[in-house]
Amino acid sequence: RRIPKMLEMKQLLLDSIAEHPELPQEERGNLLGECDLIQSFLMYNDISRMSQFHRSASEKMTRPAISIRSDGGWTFGSPSVLMMFHRKSGDLDKELEEMNQCMPHYYKITNGHGQGAETIMSAEAHFMRGNFVDAHIALEKAYTQIQGNGQESIALCCDFLAQRLSICMDIKMRNTFEERRKELLQGHNTTWVNIFDSTCAYYYAVTGQTERIPALFGAHMLSTVNFLAPG
């Protein structure tokens, strides 16, 4: 549903450039960079193609983008960056390298939107490969990287990995499930709460605590919510 709006915004920017030839070259570059950034999201979830547009936008722009809110969600409702961008068996190392290379360009033009994504994806890759100690080290690095930067969607990805790691090794999570949910409720953002509840549902299902699965999932009420709805 959002693709037509994104294309409309891109066309408005291109029309503005065409209608105002007097624009300074620097501002023309900024507007063209915005167009590249918008186009990159239409390539989701192909990190190779998205990266091409991020690099192009980074080369053209001298200011942060105005088409992206740096405090908005980065993961499209997913609690896992790995689940978002791992597309093909055997390509994980390539995908991790592409994330490492492209994200600094993206951060530059979005004021750090999604900061820590490549770090938590690396941590998840270690986890999926059974390298639990390396996963824990990378997880703590991700937590440190996002501390105080407002990237709640990445923090939720960290929480989800911490939950899964706690099943496989003896680690201390930063908050109890109840404490973390209370913290999220204080932010008055139902998207974050729903994402967190989805990770709790997974954890309780895997550990056999089915009576603790949040009602949204345990009672099969997903059709009643929109995970991407603001607030």
For the regions a protein language model found, what residue spans apply to each?
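Internal alpha-solenoid helical repeat scaffolds
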Residues: 1-158
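Helix-coil-helix junctions within alpha-helical repeat/solenoid scaffolds
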Residues: 7-15, 29, 123, 127-231
